[in-house]
Structures are given as C-alpha cells and as structure tokens.
Curated annotation (Swiss-Prot):
It is found in: Preautophagosomal structure membrane. GO terms for cellular component: Atg12-Atg5-Atg16 complex; autophagosome; mitochondria-associated endoplasmic reticulum membrane contact site; phagophore; phagophore assembly site membrane. Disulfide bonds: none annotated. Small amount of ATG5-ATG12 conjugate is enough to perform normal autophagy. Conjugated to ATG12; which is essential for autophagy. Conjugation with ATG12 involves ATG7 as an E1-like activating enzyme and ATG10 as an E2-like conjugating enzyme. This is Autophagy protein 5. Keywords: Autophagy, Isopeptide bond, Membrane, Protein transport, Transport, Ubl conjugation. There is a cross-link at residue 149 (Glycyl lysine isopeptide (Lys-Gly) (interchain with G-Cter in ATG12)). Conjugated with ATG12. The ATG5-ATG12 conjugate forms a complex with several units of ATG16. The ATG12-ATG5 conjugate also associates with ATG3. It comes from Saccharomyces cerevisiae (strain YJM789) (Baker's yeast). It comes from the Eukaryota. GO terms for molecular function: Atg8-family ligase activity. The keyword Lipid biosynthesis does not apply. It holds the Pfam family ATG5_UblA.
Length: 294
C-alpha cells in the first residue's frame, strides 16, 4: 500500500501562474508576469508564495508583505479558487468543469489542461468563502494542522492522538510536507490514523458548469460496516436534484474510481496529505441530469 501512497506523494503538476498587472510597475517586462512552476499534488498553492514574491519582487509596485489594505487570492478563468485545498484536488475539479467527459478522465485531462492555470489577483475586499493569502509563513501550517485535528476526531472520536504528538514530532510532520520526506510523513500520520475508524473524513466536490464548486462533507459511519461507494451513493450525490451514479464519474487523486470500491480501502490508499479523502464528481456527457444540474 505504501507504494501507492508514495506514487501519489511524488505526483506533480505543471502550474502556470499569471500575475495581475496591478502588482507590477509600469514598464515591467511582460515575461515577468508569467511563472511556470512544478508543484506536488500533495501541497498547498500558498506554500509557493515566497517563491512567487521573490521572482517578481524587483518589479512590484508595492510591498505585499507590509500592505495591510490589500487582499490577495487566486483565480481560474475569473473564478476565485481556494488555496486551502490540495493542489491536486483543485486540478481535478477545474479539469472536471472544463469539459463534460465522454472518454477516460486521464485522457481528457491531457487535452483540457496542460497546465493548472491560475491568476494571482488583489482587491480591497475578498470574494465570499475565500481565505486571504497572508504574509505569515505559518498560515498554511496552522490551517493544515487544524485539518488534521478534525481528521483525528472524525476517525477516533477524539483529537487525543494528534494532541499527544511532541513538539518535535509536530514540527517533523509539517516539515515532511515542505521537504517532501515521505517516510517522515507516513511515520507521523500512522500515529493519528485508525485501522477501525468510527467515521471516514470525506469531502465531496462537484464540478458545476457555472464554474463554481459545490462542497459537501457527509458523515459516513464505519461502525461494524465497510461500505462501497455504491452503498453510500445517496450520501455522495445530491439526490434531491435527481442526480444518480450514471450521471457522474467519481474522481480521486486524478483517478477514475469504480462505484464498487470499498470506502475504507479508498481512504487508506488515496487520502490526501491533510488526512481527508477528496472525491470529485465529474458530469458525464449524456447523463440524465448531469448537463443541466451540475
């Protein structure tokens, strides 16, 4: 199983970051406004902000680290996107809304998005639901650790396992994300995980043709059962809108997942670096409801 996890850990994406002209001084070279970065699927976009600022610092029209009157965030096709989701999860959802798939997800991704294209923008106020990009170097770490506290509680019924980590272990845990140390990550995360979870930390995101994300976090009990995705179809899908399994593909870590997959097996193999299992629902062309409702 660790071989699968390491393949996911080592997975990377090409990210193209375009800088809004409002950041730059007049007369700045056009090429400085576009950065191409190779980014792990299992990290946050905001972890690359020091790199981005450093690349454009000589051309900035202000100091983003001290300007408290401006907010910064990312967009894709003029739609705000959250930095607080793993990069791979964002890619899966953005690829999902770029086309209605008739062939395999993997082939469509190659055609639709050579790069994860994002735009760094700023404004006097934030779009709804978007967490601002802060100058603090610990912003991502604090958010990520909070995610793991939630995961620990969902799995075990308490946060004792993660709160019992020593200071050095907690530093080592986050350090494994930054330095890409897979063995350290597995060592610490295994102390938090459970072979008999009470519930599965699950987040569902749906690609909508409007360009927005629909996010849900169903509570899936694992007490005495190990359901397949088909068994919990009603929890995964928005049954009120008449959506069923024939209308969507289930994507996890860029892979199309069959409905007969056991939920615990899926979680054990494909959970993300923040402890959650992210499932992206992608509309299938010709589905009864997919085109009109999602």
């Amino acid at each position: 199983m660790n071989d699968i996890k390491q393949l996911l850990w080592n997975g990377e994406l090409n990210v193209l970051v375009s800088i809004d002209p409002s950041f730059l001084m007049k007369g700045s070279p056009r090429e400085i406004a576009v950065l191409r970065i190779r980014v792990p699927r299992e990290t946050y976009l905001v972890n690359y902000m020091p790199f981005i600022w450093n690349k454009i610092k000589s051309f900035l029209s202000f100091d983003p680290l001290t300007d408290s009157e401006k907010y910064f965030w990312f967009e894709h096709n003029k739609t705000p996107i959250p930095w607080n989701y793993p990069v791979g999860v964002l890619f899966d959802c953005l690829a999902g809304k770029s086309a209605t798939f008739t062939t395999s997800f993997e082939n469509q991704v190659k055609d639709v998005l050579t790069f994860l294209r994002i735009h760094l923008v700023m404004g006097d106020s934030l779009p709804p639901t978007i967490i601002p990009i802060a100058s603090s170097k610990t912003q991502a770490e604090k958010f990520w650790f909070h995610q793991w506290k939630q995961v620990c509680f969902i799995l075990n019924g308490s946060s004792k396992a993660i709160m019992s980590l020593s200071v050095n272990e907690a530093r080592k845990f986050w350090g494994s994300v930054i330095t890409r140390n897979f063995q350290d990550f597995i060592e610490i995360s295994n102390k938090i995980s459970s072979s008999r979870p009470r519930h599965i930390p699950l987040i569902i995101q749906t690609s909508r043709t409007s360009g927005t994300f629909r996010i849900s976090q169903p509570t899936i009990s694992m007490t005495g059962v190990n359901p397949t995705l088909k068994d919990i179809e009603g929890d995964i899908l928005d049954v009120k809108e008449g959506i069923n399994g024939n209308d969507v593909m289930v994507i996890c870590q860029g892979i199309e997942i069959p409905w007969h997959m056991l939920l615990y097996d899926l979680y054990s193999k494909l959970r993300s670096f923040d402890g959650f299992l992210y499932i992206t629902l992608v509309p299938i062309k010709g589905g009864d409801k997919a085109s009109s409702e999602l």
